Structures are given as structure tokens and as C-alpha cells.
């Protein structure tokens, strides 16, 4: 018989048939797996215990001033967003070859890449497991739509970096809307779904446009701080976006402001860790007025967000002050942060 030919006796053998676990056997296997829960979650829990600003949780609490969600459902939504946000950070750090997260070594440098990827994927499904608690099957639809959106945005960002292709600002805004805006939208859409004011929200006002603007402000500010903030240097390392080869907002503006100067584009391709080279790149970005452009764009978007908040405050019962405070948290003049 040929070595590649199937053994019919083996194919028909009942020993090879997969049988469902039942009774004590099922309980035993479940108990064994449960004993590994802490190990499986270790990369995730390590990241979770690092200090952070918890902007997304504060945003959820702020919007609840308008939406009045029952406390149990509000905690479910916060947990879903927390799980997804931290899972995405685990994957981001691997894809970006990051070394620091919040001032300490990234998870995959401690637990290894395979275990960290598994922990991140595990967290995605822990989040999905929470959805039935919201009591509406549409929650699954929202969850799927926004996770697909998040991965589309991440794919665009990775493609530009790996292909050394500088996007336009319009393409950048589209990417941010998908990637950064995805979790913001997921939170608010689930909140609208669970709100005691559901009838009012769906028939008169939609909070998603405001959340989209907040997401863009958050990302541009983050891009600015990556290259200009001392605190960011302590937490993530100096000019990490340059080492990563990332087309961030100030870098895109700088390259497109002077297409004949290939110095900045060339530095991005090098994935440099040399501080002197990165300092030179920062000077190139300054020379094209790109940091000022960032601040102007942030100010423009903050004004747009405040107008949307004002309109919401005039038409939706509840206080707008909490949302204003979240805007202050993510939209202050970058140099003061």
C-alpha cells in the first residue's frame, strides 16, 4: 500500500471518532481549563494593571448623563470596551514592534508573542460573551460592525507603513474614523441601544457624529504628543512613531508640504532608533509648520465638538458638563498636556 493511501481500517475505527464529553469527564476538562485561566489571561492582566487615564470609561460615564442607562448595563458596556481596548493594545504593540507601554515593558516582551496574541484574542471573545446581558440581539450586529471597522482602519495604517506610502489627510481621517473611532462608536451605539431613553434617542438625536469628532481629536493629539511630549517619551519612548515608520498626522502634513524633500520619508523607511536622527526628523517637521498645523486642526475640531455638545444639550435632557469635561481631557492645547 502506498504510504499516502488511507488505511480504511483506521478510518472506520471507533477509536478515532470524536465523542462529546459528558458528565464527570466534561466537568473534569472544564475544571482543568479553569485552572489555567490566570495563565491564559496573564499578558492581558499585566497590561490592565499598568496606570492609564481610562479616557473611554470616563467618556461612557459622561454620555450617561444624557442616556441614563441602568447601572448593570452600563457596567457591561464599560467591561466590553475595556476588554476590547486592552486587547487591541496588545496586538498594536506586537504589530508596531513597541518596547514600552505606559512606561513599562510591553506584554509580549514579558510573556512572548504567541501567548500575548492568544490573550488578546481571548479577550475579544470575553467581550462578546458579555453582549447577551444587554438583552438586545442588535448588540451583536453593532459589535461585529465596529470590530470590522476597527480592523479595516488598522489594516490601512499598516499598509501605508509597510508600503512606505504617504496617505492624504482625507485618507488619514478615514483611517482614524475606522480605527480610533471604532471603539468610541461601539460604546455609544451600545449605550443608545441600552438607554432608558431609547425611544427618544433613536427618533431625535444620534450621538455618533459627536463621537466621531472626539475620536479624530484624540488621535491627532496622540500623534502630536508622540513627537513633542516629554511625558509621552517617558511612557512610550522618544519619537516612537518615527521608529515604527508610521504616517502620523504631523508627518503626513510635513511630507506633503514639501514633496521634493525626501529626507523625512527616508528616515521613516529606516525604522531608526537613533535619537539624533529622530531629533533631526522632528526639526524637519517643525520647518514645514506641521506641529502648528496639528494644533490648528485640534482647535478647529474642538470648536466643532463643542458646537455639537451645545446642540445636544439644548435638545436632550441631562447635563452636557460631563461631556465637556471629557473634551477638555482629550482636547486641551497639546503643549499643556
Swiss-Prot record:
Reactions that this protein is recorded to catalyse: isopentenyl diphosphate + dimethylallyl diphosphate = (2E)-geranyl diphosphate + diphosphate; isopentenyl diphosphate + (2E)-geranyl diphosphate = (2E,6E)-farnesyl diphosphate + diphosphate; isopentenyl diphosphate + (2E,6E)-farnesyl diphosphate = (2E,6E,10E)-geranylgeranyl diphosphate + diphosphate
This protein's UniProt keywords: Magnesium, Metal-binding, Transferase
The keyword Magnesium appears for this protein: yes
Binding residues annotated for Mg(2+) 1, in chain numbering: 92, 96
Disulfide links within the chain: none
Pathway entry: Secondary metabolite biosynthesis; terpenoid biosynthesis
EC supergroup of this enzyme: transferase
Disruption phenotype: Results in faster growth and increased resistances to heat and UV stress. Also leads to increased virulence using S.furcifera as the insect host.
Cofactor list: Mg(2+)
Keyword 4Fe-4S: no
One biological process term in Gene Ontology: alcohol biosynthetic process
Sample GO molecular function, one term: dimethylallyltranstransferase activity
Chain residues that bind Mg(2+) 3: 222
Binding site for isopentenyl diphosphate: 53, 56, 85, 102
Manner of cofactor binding, per the entry note: Binds 3 Mg(2+) ions per subunit.
Residue sites binding Mg(2+) 2 per the record: 92, 96
EC number annotated for this UniProt entry: 2.5.1.-, 2.5.1.1, 2.5.1.29, 2.5.1.10
Similarity comment: Belongs to the FPP/GGPP synthase family.
Name of the protein described by the UniProt record: Geranylgeranyl pyrophosphate synthase subD
Lineage: Eukaryota, Fungi, Dikarya, Ascomycota, Pezizomycotina
